[in-house]
């Protein structure tokens, strides 16, 4: 029925996809995340920050953002926050429900770079990974700020600990150094995503050595496990995409969705809702690698800005980690804090799920939030490149070329 051409197309899709250098960054970022998880950097920062900020709800959100900026692995973030913050906050008398929600909501912020799902999403949508990282950075920080505003309305126990400003400065430097190496080098055009991931992995090893908590063997084994799952799904999705396209499945989907009597923004909303529902039974690699390519022709036909849509989709995928009854974040948290009831954890995540949905609505109303920073970086980097090209130009060769 399919013919030899289908298998030829599947083969070429497979080779072309795996030869994309963006995928080479995946194991490095995962490895960096597992090294950081065991290095003890975050625990030290939490111990010093709690004396300065006072409100541990806010401290957990700040730490969650820093973990996301340094690692981008959901399981590691939630597990680390649960082990580190939950017992201390319960001992001080913080609200258990809000504590669980803050840890789950903060730990699920996988869209903040360097994010492994974004690395996979960029080539799937034919986007530049640097543009995508820049696009999600501002909305990600916006969501973190919305979390803080929500938590600030709740009362908190008073703390008698004296602020340790000097210790905070010392403890924040290692993570700041790592984030600057990874994120700064990419956003300002100093390194590709693969090079930045390599620098980040090397930097994480150095910091773990300095902290005396390097667990290289365990980190390598976990990196191999996680990377194998992601890459296996990538291989399967490429073959599926080739067969699906050859059989005309994409045409059927495009025609069906385009025939709906609704405006393009509503069509995009329907696609995001479908992706959210698919995120319940499936992990994010399946949604991004298998189902997203099916919807791409519809988005192209309706002239949807792919960068803006990718940012919205990243938040949607992030929201699935907080949506009962399949919210994976709740099971990560239950594993490290077994005394918390699973039903209570589910209820605690719902306000943070609605905050993320509100962020998507804001992006629909003000799409420039997702696009202005990538555009700014393009202008800034192009100015630098033009200046460099002007300084190293060779007018005699340019004249020879013009004469010819």
Model regions and ranges:
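Alpha-helical transmembrane segments of multi-pass membrane transport proteins
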Residues: 1-404
């Amino acid at each position: 029925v399919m013919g030899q051409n289908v298998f030829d197309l599947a083969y070429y899709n497979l080779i072309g996809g795996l030869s994309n250098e963006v995928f080479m960054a995946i194991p490095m970022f995962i490895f960096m995340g597992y090294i950081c998880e065991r290095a003890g950097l975050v625990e030290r920062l939490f111990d010093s920050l709690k004396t300065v900020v006072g409100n541990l709800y806010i401290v957990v959100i700040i730490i969650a953002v820093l973990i996301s900026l340094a690692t981008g692995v959901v399981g590691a973030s939630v597990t680390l926050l649960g082990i580190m913050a939950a017992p201390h906050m319960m001992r001080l008398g913080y609200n258990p429900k809000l504590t669980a929600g803050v840890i789950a909501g903060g730990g699920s912020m996988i869209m903040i770079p360097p994010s492994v799902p974004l690395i996979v999403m960029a080539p799937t949508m034919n986007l530049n990974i640097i543009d995508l990282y820049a696009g999600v950075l501002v909305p990600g920080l916006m969501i973190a700020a919305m979390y803080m505003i929500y938590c600030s309305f709740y009362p908190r126990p008073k703390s008698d600990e004296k602020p340790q400003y000097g210790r905070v400065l010392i403890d924040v430097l290692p993570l700041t150094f790592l984030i600057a190496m990874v994120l700064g080098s990419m956003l300002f055009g100093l390194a590709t995503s693969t090079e930045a991931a390599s620098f980040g992995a090397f930097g994480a090893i150095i910091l773990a050595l300095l902290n005396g908590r390097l667990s290289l063997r365990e980190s390598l084994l976990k990196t191999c496990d996680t990377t194998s799952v992601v890459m296996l799904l990538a291989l399967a999705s490429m073959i599926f995409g080739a067969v699906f396209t050859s059989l005309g499945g994409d045409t059927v989907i495009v025609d069906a969705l385009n025939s709906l009597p609704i405006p393009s923004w509503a069509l995009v909303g329907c696609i995001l809702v479908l992706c959210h529902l698919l995120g319940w039974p499936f992990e994010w690699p399946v949604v991004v690698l298998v189902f997203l390519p099916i919807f791409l022709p519809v988005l192209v036909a309706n002239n949807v800005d792919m960068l803006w849509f990718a940012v919205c989709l990243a938040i949607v995928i992030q929201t699935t980690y907080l949506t009962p009854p399949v919210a994976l974040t709740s099971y990560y948290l239950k594993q490290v804090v077994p005394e918390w009831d699973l039903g209570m954890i589910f209820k605690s995540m719902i306000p943070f799920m609605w905050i993320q949905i509100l962020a998507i609505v804001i992006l629909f109303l003000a799409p420039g939030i997702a696009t202005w920073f990538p555009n700014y970086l393009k202008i800034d980097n192009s100015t630098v490149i033009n200046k460099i090209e002007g300084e190293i130009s060779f007018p005699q060769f340019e004249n020879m070329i013009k004469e010819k």
